[in-house]
Every structure is written in C-alpha cells, then in structure tokens.
UniProtKB/Swiss-Prot annotation:
Residues 1-85 form the PDZ domain. It comes from Bos taurus (Bovine). This is PDZ and LIM domain protein 7. The modification Phosphothreonine is found at residue 96. Residues 81-221 are annotated as: Disordered.
C-alpha cells in the first residue's frame, strides 16, 4: 500500500464522491471522480482509501462526519490517501500456427453465455455503493460532484467486448481459466487489510461534540418547547430520517431538500418556521405553542402573560404570586420600606403588606413576662398596661397563674391574694 498526500485548492466542488465510513463498517474511500475535476487533475483515483482529512484521522469518522469535515475546508482541502499496488499480470504465451483455419475459443453458445454472465459478476471499481445508498446521498445533498445524466452513464458503460479469434493448433487446448481475479483496488477492504476487523469492530464508537445555544430561561409556570434542529435526512411531513422518506414542510407542503427543523412532530423549512404574530424566524431560541399557533417568547408574553394586580399591565418577566393573584416583582413591595418582598415572609396590616422586620418594629408586641414577641395566634391578655402571654401572667412570688383571678400589683408586678402584702 502506497500512502501519499493531495492538496486541492478551493472552492468546491472538489470533483469526487466518498463512500464508506465507520457507520457502514467500511473504510472511507473514493467512489467516483468527475472527469477533468480537481481531484482527477491531482492524481486521485477511484478506490483510493482516505487516511486523513485536513490532518484529522479518518478511521474514526462516520460518513456524515467526513462530509462535514470536507465542507469545513473552504479554500484548501488536504487529503492523505492510500493506494494498493496493482497486480502484475504474467505474460501469456500465444501460439501462432500458420495456415490453420480460425475457430472460436468457446466451442458452443452455452459456454459463451456462461462467460458473459461471469463477466457481469466482476466487481466494478468505483461502483461499490448500492442504489439505495446513492439515492440517500442525493436526497441529503451530500455529494461533492455533479452527477452525469443517466443517458451518459449508460453510453459510457456499454463498451463493446471483442474477442480475438484464436487459431486452432494440433496440440490440445488448455481449459478456460475462468474470470480474471479482480485487482486489489476493486477487492473489498476486509479481504485486503488484515487489521480491518479490529479497526472497525462494532464496540468501537465515536463521539461528536456540537455547540448548542440554550433558549432563554422560561417564565415560571409556563411551558417552553425548544427547537430540535436536524441535519438533512428523510421523513414525510416531519418524520425525520428514521423511516427513510423525504420530509415535507408543514407550512408550504413542499418537499424539503437540505436542512430542516422538526418541531411539535412536524418538519419545516428553517425560513418558514416563524412566529404567528410578528413573523420572526424561530430557527434559534425557544418558542410557545398555543391553540395550534406558534409564538416567539416576546409575543407570547404580551398576548398570554398574566396581568399585575396593582398596575394592571402584562407581566412579561418574573412573576410574583401572592394573595391568590399575580404581581410584578417591583409592584409587590413592603408598605414601609418599599423593598420588593419576593419570596420572603410578610404580614398584612390594614390591607397593606409589610416585611417581617418592619412589621415587628411597627406593630410587634412583646410579652411583659418573658420579653419575647407575641406572635399571631398566640393567646395573650392585657394587664397593668402591658401585654402578657396567658402562661406568663403569674404571681411574682409563687408563680401561680393569675388568668381570670383576682390579683394585686406592686411595682408593676402581679401578686396573688396570698402574697398581696409580701415584699417584692
């Protein structure tokens, strides 16, 4: 095997077509050349194996990855190729008897048909792809050369075969040797390369890293759906490339050639997947679906966003849920310090919200007995001009509870009847 490097100057087309790839368990190779194209002028031949593309090893690339790698080389394409040595045929000795009548080498018509059929079995260089594979390459738009029309292919393939009549000799004729062994360039790679099975084992995988732009963070309580952008494949009406059918745009009902978007189970041309209200193309970012219509985030917020209970305007950003309604964050604030309450605790006093520190400062009450705050829901009583927890209003000497009982007071401290005249 001879390895060599070829550099093609851009722009595309480069004048060749690839076949194989890791996903086909077949090494990448040149399957067809454009006559007079850039690849043909650089000495590339049909059957050459592709070792690297622009310096990257091609052994771990799938068919689509290799094509994308070639597309990325805009003005300069560097390929490392490998070519098998052609087999040298041995010269055959031909006897030329004189003055003998000529007769065909094949004695009867049945052997003649057998030879013709056998000729058809020979592998033809450059046609290793199946018809379905070529159709897939045509649908996906991943070809690197312009195909000649079918009539030209048929004319170029119909090369007349002529057999030189072999004169009969007195010596016995040698038996027909059978079809010629194909050259190494047309033999399958698993028969030529002993390391093929190990290199393309099924358990070996390749990883593709792609950059993806995340849509904006969705508004709380809303459901955003992101766009799934697919490479060109197959799919009828949005099925994609899994069922092998050509995708049809849901908007214009035309067959899609090239890139397309899949959203809500339907396929679209990228330029026809637009907002129903403003007409903005939604190829990048998120979108909303409401009653069968598609909206961009700004239009959806304006049309379907909730209203603020204070200013009555649409809430297009962060939503504050409080008191069984919705608010702008800057509209639901403390009545004292005017700071947004957000997710903090708050208290209502005379219909206005207060944050916890301001409420305690303005309306908070402390127990005279324990000096702790009397929270909402706590049982308390008013006595001696102060507020008391019901469990804290006790005799200052014997600690008996005085709630609902007669008591005496000395130095603002409650005393029971037994200790009314005791020293405090």
């Amino acid at each position: 095997m001879d390895s060599f490097k070829v550099v093609l100057e851009g722009p595309a087309p480069w004048g060749f077509r690839l076949q194989g790839g890791k996903d086909f368990n077949v090494p990448l190779s040149i399957s067809r050349l454009t006559p007079g194209g850039k690849a043909a002028q650089a000495g590339v031949a049909v059957g050459d194996w592709v070792l690297s593309i622009d310096g990257e090893n091609a052994g771990g690339l799938t068919h689509i990855e290799a094509q994308n790698k070639i597309r990325a080389c805009g003005e300069r394409l560097s390929l490392s190729l490998s070519r098998a040595q052609p087999a040298q045929s041995k010269p055959q000795k031909v006897q030329t008897p004189d003055k003998q009548p000529l007769r065909p080498l094949v004695p009867d018509a049945s052997k003649q048909r057998l030879m013709e059929d056998t000729e058809d079995w020979r592998p033809r260089p450059g046609t290793g792809q199946s018809r379905s594979f070529r159709i897939l390459a045509h649908l996906t738009g991943t070809e690197f050369m312009q195909d000649p029309d079918e009539e030209h292919l048929k004319k170029s393939s119909q090369v007349p075969r002529t057999e030189a009549p072999t004169p009969a000799s007195a010596t016995p004729q040698e038996p027909w040797p059978g079809p010629t062994t194909p050259s190494p360039t047309s033999r399958p790679p698993w028969a030529v390369d002993p390391a093929f099975a190990e290199r393309y084992a099924p358990d070996k995988t390749s990883t593709v890293l792609t950059r993806h732009t995340q849509p904006a963070t969705p508004t709380p309580m809303q459901n955003r759906t992101s766009i799934v952008q697919a490479a060109a494949g197959g799919g009828h009406g949005g099925g994609g490339g899994s069922n092998g059918k050509t995708p049809v745009c849901h908007q214009c009902h035309k067959v899609i050639r090239g890139r397309y978007l899949v959203a809500l189970g339907r396929a679209y041309h990228p330029e026809e997947f637009v907002c129903s209200q403003c007409g903005k193309v939604l190829e990048e970012g998120g979108f909303f679906e409401e009653k069968g219509a598609i909206f961009c985030p700004p239009c959806y917020d304006v049309r379907y966003a909730p209203s603020c209970a204070k200013c009555k305007k649409k809430i297009t950003g962060e939503v504050m849920h409080a008191l069984k309604t919705t608010w702008h964050v800057h509209c639901f604030t403390c009545a004292a310090c005017k700071a947004p309450i957000r997710n903090r605790a708050f208290y209502m006093e005379e219909g206005a919200p207060y944050c916890e520190p301001d409420y305690e400062k303005m309306f908070g009450t402390k127990c005279r007995g324990c000096d702790f705050k009397i929270d909402a829901g706590d049982r308390f009583l008013e006595a001696l001009g102060f507020s008391w927890h019901d469990t804290c209003f006790v005799c200052a000497i014997c600690q008996i509870n005085l709630e609902g009982k007669t008591f005496y007071s000395k130095k603002d401290k409650p005393l029971c009847k037994s200790h009314a005249f005791s020293h405090v």
